[in-house]
Structure formats: C-alpha cells, structure tokens
Regions:
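Bacterial N-terminal signal peptides
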Residues: 7-17
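Positively charged n-region of N-terminal signal peptides that target proteins for export
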Residues: 1-3
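Extracytoplasmic metal-acquisition and chelation regions
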Residues: 16, 20-260
C-alpha cells in the first residue's frame, strides 16, 4: 500500500514535470520560428522545455493514442513535408519514422533520434527482438536517460538555429537540473521501502525500475501487445494476493479490461 501511494505521487510529479541539410548556416530568419514536429507527448514536453517561444511545435501522434499502435496519416505527411526538424524517441518506439520521412520528401528535414547515446536496456524475448529491435524503447521513463534526450534535443535545435543556441542549451541545463533533483529525491524515498514490486498493465517501466531499484510485474509485454495466457494471468493473480497488491497501474491509451 505504501509503495502504491508513493509510486502514484511520483507518477503525478513526473507527469507534471514532463507534461515528446541544406545551406552551410541553417539558422532561420529573425522572424521565423523553427517548425518542429515531435512524435508523442514526452518528446513534446522535452522539446517545449528547451525551445520555449523560439519554436513552433506540432505533435504527430494524437493524445489518447497508443504510440505503439500509431500509423502515419495524410496529416502526418503534411506536417513532415513542412517541418524543419523531426524529433522522435527511437526506431524501436516509432518504427514508421524512416518510411514516413522518405514519403514526405522533405530534403531539408533534420531527423533527431532523442534517445541516441542513452544507456539502453536490452530485450530478452526473441519475438520482441525480431519485431522491434534489440532494445526496450521506453528510455524517456528513466530520469537519467531523459536528461540525455533533453541534451540531444537542445543540440539539434542549437545546430538548426545558431542565433538562439545559447538559449536552447541554457534551458536544457535548467530542465535537467530539475530532472536530476527529482531523481535524487525519489531514489532516497524508494530506498526506504521494503516492498519494491508493483503490477502494471504494460511492461513499460524497466528504465524507471532501474533508476529506483524497483521490480515490475506486467500483464502485457513491452510493446502492449498480445493477450496474457491463462497460466500467466493465474500467476499474476496469485502474486497480487500473496503481496497484498491493491493497485494495478494502467495507461489511459491501453484497455484496462484484462487488468480489471
């Protein structure tokens, strides 16, 4: 129960804090804001924190849509064809990015993989590796990895808009200080807990678990796909009873039916 309360409180804080070629000098004209498209909300929050009023930002994946299930639309292509920069998390998360950017036929589009150089967690299931690549894509859920993503975004904006480069880097540094403070605060809180296991509908929290020494038990796999077998569901039910689990954390974009 204590773990559930602290984890829920942490989730609220994290949501509030995180609420995603051409010429030699690609800097835009003084009256032109960079047109930045991002894939989903975490990328939007990081990018907005860095770019603030110097950029115009558009999200490709609508609110309430499960990012793993998203497929590009005509509207997606239109946004990409007009953008200066695309910021996405990783090829494991947004596997459609390469084909979509090719189809958009925008030779000046700068494509930024925010999770580059993060300390990624390797997948272990052969089926997941074949379908999605070698790594768990949920890097932004680590407050350590998130800081790398913010820095990568800042450097991309600085390269595209040299006039405001210092502005972007300053904002990134200030935002990362907040992330680091949050990381330190919750490492201390979670270190005091005896019960560090929790149950979630979707195995998306390996990075958060690594940050805080937690252990997730999940109903669905890393990519929110497939139905659990009767055997696995039975094991989870028994686990919840044995450990007196009162809460299952389910994402808004994922059906809560199985969790219920």
């Amino acid at each position: 129960k204590k773990l559930s309360i602290i984890f829920f409180f942490f989730s609220l804080l994290l949501c509030n804090l995180l609420a995603g070629c051409g010429s030699k000098d690609p800097a835009p004209a003084a009256d032109h804001k960079l047109r930045v498209v991002v894939t989903f909300n975490a990328m939007k929050e990081f990018t907005q924190a860095v770019g603030q009023d110097k950029i115009h930002i558009t999200s490709l994946i609508p609110d309430g849509t499960e990012p793993h299930d998203f497929q590009p639309t005509t509207k997606t292509m239109q946004a990409l064809s007009k953008a200066d920069i695309l910021i996405y998390n990783s090829t494991g998360m947004e596997r459609w990015v390469e084909q979509a950017t090719q189809a958009a036929a925008n030779p000046k589009l700068v494509i930024v993989e925010a999770s580059k150089d993060t300390d990624r967690i390797s997948l272990t299931e052969a089926d997941e590796i074949r379908a999605h690549g070698q790594y768990d894509p949920h890097t932004w859920l680590s407050l350590s990895c998130a800081q790398t993503e913010v820095k990568n975004i800042a450097e991309a904006l600085a390269a595209a808009d040299k006039t405001n480069a210092d502005f972007y880097r300053k904002n990134a540094a200030e935002y990362n200080q907040k992330l680091q403070a949050l990381l330190a605060a919750y490492q201390k809180k979670f270190s005091k807990l005896e019960q560090k296991d929790f149950v979630t509908g979707h195995a998306a929290f390996a990075y958060l678990c690594r940050d805080f020494g937690l252990q997730q038990q999940s109903i669905e796999d890393v990519f929110a796909s497939g139905e659990p077998s009767a055997q696995n569901l039975g094991k989870l039910t028994a686990y919840c009873k044995e450990h007196n689990v009162k809460t299952i954390f389910v994402e808004e974009a994922v059906s809560p039916k199985t969790s219920e």
